[in-house]
């Protein structure tokens, strides 16, 4: 039997990362979560804006991503909103990332968080930080594209 097309529901998108970094490659990673975190993600209470990923001891860790506490749960059973979460990737992907991050000085940034079927996934971007003039150039290019699209409509 053919495998059904998996449904993808984007929960949070980090648009700021595409402005601050030049994204060279993207990777998909699973994420190790607690029960209340999954419920909070389903409600869309995630902020990826300040997040980044670190490589420690052959594992990938997601830092500084804010998942709000689940409001229908008691305080005792809830999670810490900014706790460090382990990302689940294949060993060969992690080894490849270690080489690129350490040698080339690149950064791992979460681009979006989504449900793939019933699993929570994080799209990680391997990026290089943009300088100020690169950011200005991006803004100019975006404005020019908007102007051209507006002119083509007429």
UniProtKB/Swiss-Prot annotation:
GO molecular function term, any single one: RNA binding
GO BP annotations listed: trans-translation
InterPro entries xref list: SmpB (IPR023620), SsrA-bd_prot (IPR000037), SsrA-bd_prot_CS (IPR020081)
CDD domains: SmpB
Keyword Methyltransferase among record annotations: no
Alphabetical keyword list: Cytoplasm, RNA-binding
Subcellular location: Cytoplasm
Predominant subcellular localization, coarse grouping: cytoplasm
One CC-aspect GO term: cytosol
Record's keyword annotation contains Cytoplasm: yes
Family listed: Belongs to the SmpB family.
Job description of the protein: Required for rescue of stalled ribosomes mediated by trans-translation. Binds to transfer-messenger RNA (tmRNA), required for stable association of tmRNA with ribosomes. tmRNA and SmpB together mimic tRNA shape, replacing the anticodon stem-loop with SmpB. tmRNA is encoded by the ssrA gene; the 2 termini fold to resemble tRNA(Ala) and it encodes a 'tag peptide', a short internal open reading frame. During trans-translation Ala-aminoacylated tmRNA acts like a tRNA, entering the A-site of stalled ribosomes, displacing the stalled mRNA.
Protein name per Swiss-Prot or TrEMBL: SsrA-binding protein
Organism name: Synechocystis sp. (strain ATCC 27184 / PCC 6803 / Kazusa)
Gene that specifies this protein: smpB
């Amino acid at each position: 039997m053919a495998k059904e097309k998996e449904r993808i529901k984007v929960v949070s998108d980090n648009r700021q990362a595409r402005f601050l970094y030049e994204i060279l490659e993207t990777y998909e990673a699973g994420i190790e979560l607690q029960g209340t975190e999954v419920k909070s993600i389903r409600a869309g209470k995630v902020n990826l804006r300040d997040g980044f990923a670190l490589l420690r001891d052959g594992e990938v860790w997601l830092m500084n991503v804010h998942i709000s506490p689940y409001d229908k749960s008691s305080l005792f059973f809830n999670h810490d909103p900014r706790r460090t979460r382990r990302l689940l990737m294949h060993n060969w992907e992690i080894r490849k990332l270690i080489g690129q991050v350490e040698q080339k000085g690149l950064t791992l940034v979460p681009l979006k968080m989504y449900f793939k079927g019933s699993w929570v996934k994080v799209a990680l971007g391997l990026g290089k930080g943009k300088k100020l003039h690169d950011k200005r150039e991006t803004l100019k290019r975006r404005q020019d594209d908007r102007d051209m699209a507006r002119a083509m409509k007429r």
